[in-house]
Amino acid sequence: MGSLEKERTTTGWAARDPSGVLSPYTYSLRNTGPEDLYIKVLSCGICHSDIHQIKNDLGMSHYPMVPGHEVVGEVLEVGSEVTKYRVGDRVGTGIVVGCCRSCSPCNSDQEQYCNKKIWNYNDVYTDGKPTQGGFAGEIVVGERFVVKIPDGLESEQAAPLMCAGVTVYSPLVRFGLKQSGLRGGILGLGGVGHMGVKIAKAMGHHVTVISSSDKKRTEALEHLGADAYLVSSDENGMKEATDSLDYIFDTIPVVHPLEPYLALLKLDGKLILTGVINAPLQFISPMVMLGRKSITGSFIGSMKETEEMLEFCKEKGLTSQIEVIKMDYVNTALERLEKNDVRYRFVVDVVGSKLD
């Protein structure tokens, strides 16, 4: 990042072990360089993948760990080589804060697929300092991994878009599914799923929410604007929906069967996996062969796609549905999130919280 300019300390809420319990933690931020922004965190969303990380579900966690990758903040200081941002700008950043800048993904605006990417927490930056996330008073981020939040989008509403929003937007664009008239399915109505309904509807798609029970029917149809609701245990309903969907977003973050949902896809339909699962998923090959169907995955989106998604949401008047909390409620919120007891994203009011 060039010559080092300044090192600062901040206080965040960190997990110390796989219990996942967060508590105040004061630490040094990495040194800021000429391409960096020093940012005061305003709001930070809570994603289900944060639970996987703080509880070491994937076997790769290092402690102390400050989670949070759906971050919106205010620029307090810019490095000498920063050109896109000024002090006072409201900006967002996500789960990737570094890349090699020379590989094929990096050179094609797909830096989230760089094999040398640096995660915004539970990783190590190029200077050897551990990266820490957005459940903290301040962060340091390179300008390449920051986007400006459009006027008209409130900070707490914008935060979940940095992950949940672009996780849906990116594959719709990349897989040629942006045109109106398509029929899409949303499997799982959580943080990503509810944005899937909103964004797909705004693109002119017919949207079916697929859930394990009937309890979210009214929310899906009347509040989020879905066109249809399908209960996966309803054999007749599932049979009637066979070969009806162009794509399905599978947002479920736990092990589940794939075959019932593959049956819902049309010829050349896509099952797009976006949920982080730490165990194998299974299916029999004829389920994809006989319909030339695809099981694929997608990981967040590039910074370019994030900018496009934010403008799309502003243009269409889309916001995330959230429950705003203070930091001292975060452990309760994480427990509720594990039980799917949130509509549909917790967002921490970091700037309004007592952190120490």
Curated annotation (Swiss-Prot):
Gene Ontology biological-process annotations: lignin biosynthetic process
A GO MF term: zinc ion binding
Keywords: Lignin biosynthesis, Metal-binding, NADP, Oxidoreductase, Zinc
Binding site for Zn(2+) 1: C47, H69, E70, C163
Co-factor binding details: Binds 2 Zn(2+) ions per subunit.
Gene3D superfamilies listed in its UniProt record: Medium-chain alcohol dehydrogenases, catalytic domain, NAD(P)-binding Rossmann-like Domain
Keyword Repressor: no
Binding-site positions, Zn(2+) 2: C100, C103, C106, C114
A family per Pfam: ADH_zinc_N
Domain of life: Eukaryota
Main function: Involved in lignin biosynthesis. Catalyzes the final step specific for the production of lignin monomers. Catalyzes the NADPH-dependent reduction of coniferaldehyde, 5-hydroxyconiferaldehyde, sinapaldehyde, 4-coumaraldehyde and caffeyl aldehyde to their respective alcohols.
Protein name: Probable cinnamyl alcohol dehydrogenase
Name of encoding gene: CAD
